[in-house]
Amino acid sequence: VISVILPEEDMPFLPDGTPVDIILNPIGVSSRMNLGQILETHLGLAAGTLGIQAKAPVFSGHNIIAIEDMLARIWIINQANKNFGPLSIDLETHTYIEENSVKDWLNSKNQDYDKVFGANYPGEAREACLRIWLKDDQGIDTADLSIDEIENQVFLLNQQQNIAAPTLGKSVLYDGKTGEQFDQPISVGYIYMMKLSHLVEDKVHARSTGPYSLITQQPLGGK
């Protein structure tokens, strides 16, 4: 059910000014037990940003660490983009044309590019992302912290201050009408939406008199 249709300038927007296209009621995901929407949202964001194909078979799809690694790489690319200008992706080979910019940025943060973007190092991108994010954005020194202690810091920030780490797939959104920031970080990504031809005007009908049930005293079925 579509509750309201707004002009693009009134839709919530990301920190870079990009408006969202559709807003889904989060209750609709849990009530229908369709957690695949959340999975598709995260993988769609990763595929659109990293230039990859995200395939998720039922029993052999991406695990949590793999998804968090993808989200971490997106954040790393965006941070490098701020410092070294826009990055471009070769859509045929799915490789970064200006990957040296990302390498230089990671080297400045004492992180290994080959491990962060390597397929044989699961969890490396997530850990590097969280260490950099906690130090640069939250002012928390992570040099002497283990990965478990880092995850605990991320959990506390999320629970106590409503601050979402980059690996959670959430983003800060601003109200398109007032420009004010929403209280909670919100999941944002890419997802395929299909419109079904269920229109109210084809279903609504009314009558003054007609047959009714003797038990419930309600009108019988049909128009």
Task: Go through each PLM region and give its residues.
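Long insertion/accessory domains within large nucleic-acid-processing enzymes
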Residues: 1-223
